[in-house]
Amino acid sequence: MKNTKIKETIERLHTQVNEFVDEGRYQDYLKFINKFWNRSAFNQLLIYMYKDKASYVMGYKQWIDKFNRIPVACIVCRAIAVKDCNCNERKAPVRIPQLAPMTYKKENELGEEEEKMFFRDVYVFDISDTEPIADLPVKEIVSLLEWVDVEIEDINLENKLIALINDKGFDFKYDDTGSDTLNGWTDYARKEIVVSNDRPKAQQIKTIVHEIGHMLAHDITTLGDMLAPRELKECEAESIAFVVLDTLGIDTSSYSVGYVAGWTNNEEDLLIDSIQTVSKNAKFILEYLQDSKPE
């Protein structure tokens, strides 16, 4: 039964997540997911668990139809009639499970049609486990974010980030923070983000993205966020900023993202919740920037 299979996949994810989210590998994971920023947090985790060197994944039929490539395995030899293939020399491709959302319509008790959602398990393959199909032209794979080749000084990036803040109902301003170490803050009561006016532009942009992370992910007016450790919230905001800036190709070599597992007491559910928070909000920011790209 497929539901059982999906449940087993999720259970495996929960039990293994602590194995890589340690002090040495968490930041590597954040760097890894920038290649898959538009996938769900669960699917990002699954790709990393099954093939942490993956760079571009797609389903079996998609590889064939879109890029004239095919996952390498013995069955492939038969499919494309390679008669002289020595199957013993071929390495089976890694089948990476993914949870694909599906929708259907069903009548409720009032006879009204409602849209329902369920998940089915599918498999994808990394490009490293594929090869071009003989006698067909090779098609180039273009990055989804090819247009965002930004510089940290780019005024358009700054304007888009400030527009995002305004669209979420917050004001933004540069001001004197009164401290050499305080780069900025998010004021939830006044619905305002303030960033230091005397920092280099690169630092200002990084701080803006960090504070947007707080704005989207945290709300001190709710009990859950009030009780959450400040260090965890800082780690989540810094993680969001790291994923966004790294995906945009902006230098993140100076970043030292905190130890998220330490602030969730290594509890799998809390740890995955935190990873989902980072993934969801980084994706929101990147989609906003992509949707507001200039014509």
Where on the chain are the PLM-derived regions?
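N-terminal accessory/interface modules of nucleic-acid-binding and processing proteins
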Residues: 1-236, 240-295
